[in-house]
Amino acid sequence: MTAQSAQSDNQVLLTMTNVSKSFPGVKALDKANLTVKSHSVHALMGENGAGKSTLLKCLFGIYAKDEGEILFLGKPVNFKTSKEALENGISMVHQELNLVRQRNVMDNLWLGRYPLKGVFVDHTKMYNDTKAIFDELDIDIDPREKVANLSVSQMQMIEIAKAFSYNAKIVIMDEPTSSLSEKEVEHLFKIIEKLKDRGCGIVYISHKMDEIFKICDEITILRDGKWINTVPVKGSTMEQIVAMMVGRELTQRFPPKINEPKEVILEVEHLTALNQPSIQDINFELRKGEILGIAGLVGAKRTDIVETIFGVRERKSGTVKLHGKIMKNRTALEAINNGFALVTEERRSTGIYANLSIEFNSLISNMKSYMNKWGLLSDKKMKSDTQWVIDSMNVKTPSHKTTIGSLSGGNQQKVVIGRWLLTQPEILMLDEPTRGIDVGAKYEIYQLIMQLAQKDKGIIMISSEMPELLGITDRILVMSNGKVAGIVETAKTSQEEILQLAAKYL
């Protein structure tokens, strides 16, 4: 698929010029610019906190801009709500999908604008109109199916179809592939090409550089709220884009290997989860100071391994040994007390308490250690440990009382890792630790993982990003349909070998 195919009729659809927005103590946008053309995919890039979300919220009327001009189809606009923007032809497919799960697909597509036959909803027309849109976009979903029964990728297709139904001129996609398999990503890209062919302008927000270079035509880079540059994808390199994003040249994508695996610390033998389908007969060893990656396609049950070890998924059979001693880990609390820690995949839903402070989020897994014999909390020790998390994890924040939800994804993840380190684990399990994190913060997370391995922690890291696994691990365990398809040495393997193993039991 060529992303850079030239279109002779690239009409300018949207121009945002010198848009600024300030909040108390923070200038979130400082004369930011964005120009989107028809028949094109335009990447909006920048580290977390660069101003991407604020710029789009100014477009949708969620924030009132302080200054600047927005032109849509050549006319000045000042939308007061996202509904007004949508009705005028600007749609957004959010990372957190906005669907009513207990209603069916066509209800969601036409919510608030049902076709009527007299005073009654015309269900036949609604079905036929939905089917026509799905046929045009090659979406194979029954319009009468309940949304709750669909996969994340199918829900995403409905959001795109909804934008299509409004005859949107501009479709904004926020991290659209974060939960998709490789096959689903390819399908999404085909739909994006169809939208391009219809004359749409797509604004594509993603931290995945390979996707940007595959599907996009132009890239706008923001940094610290400022417009840095807009460049064509053709003729640009990943290194140039990263340098503009972070304000410095990132000579290496991954830090140098400084860890040295030693003796075996963890033995997992014949591990099978109780509720199937799940993991079956899992066997592997982990050495002190080793980073063991876990690879596999979506649905391979990679997460089930760490959940079963950690006690949040019930074990049917098998043993987990730490230093040769059997660990039952019947609950997460028992696992924590035995020296295990788990950084979960869904940071926002299961990793952080978004509306509470950095202090609370840093200490919650170890709260018992801050109580004296009368059950009172030691404020001094709590403040000291929170400051340790902030300093040692290099968390960028004005205060330990700052709400964690206001931090960038990278800083949130650092707090979560720091929280678990306060429990002094010997085994640290990380499930998709860099998902939704910008390229500069990713490098910091990699450095942190490497340093922990150097301090003799045993690290298990699940990742869907193949370059990440190949760049940071010592060995890779490949899962296929709940079983171990193979364990390979990272230095001697290839992406092709890993993908072949991942398909072994399909």
From Swiss-Prot:
CDD domains from the UniProt entry: ABC_Carb_Monos_I, ABC_Carb_Monos_II
Gene Ontology CC: one annotated term: plasma membrane
Binding site for ATP: G46, E47, N48, G49, A50, G51, K52, S53
Signal peptide: none
EC main group: translocase
Main location: membrane
SUPFAM superfamilies per the UniProt record, alphabetical: P-loop containing nucleoside triphosphate hydrolases (SSF52540)
Enzyme Commission designation: 7.5.2.11
Cellular localization per UniProt: Cell inner membrane
Superkingdom, taxonomy of origin: Bacteria
Domain ABC transporter: 14-249, 264-506
Assembly description: The complex is composed of one ATP-binding protein (MglA), two transmembrane proteins (MglC) and a solute-binding protein (MglB).
Family the UniProt entry places it in: Belongs to the ABC transporter superfamily. Galactose/methyl galactoside importer (TC 3.A.1.2.3) family.
Reported function: Part of the ABC transporter complex MglABC involved in galactose/methyl galactoside import. Responsible for energy coupling to the transport system.
Protein name: Galactose/methyl galactoside import ATP-binding protein MglA
Source organism: Mannheimia succiniciproducens (strain KCTC 0769BP / MBEL55E)
Lineage: Bacteria, Pseudomonadati, Pseudomonadota, Gammaproteobacteria, Pasteurellales
Gene from which this protein is expressed: mglA
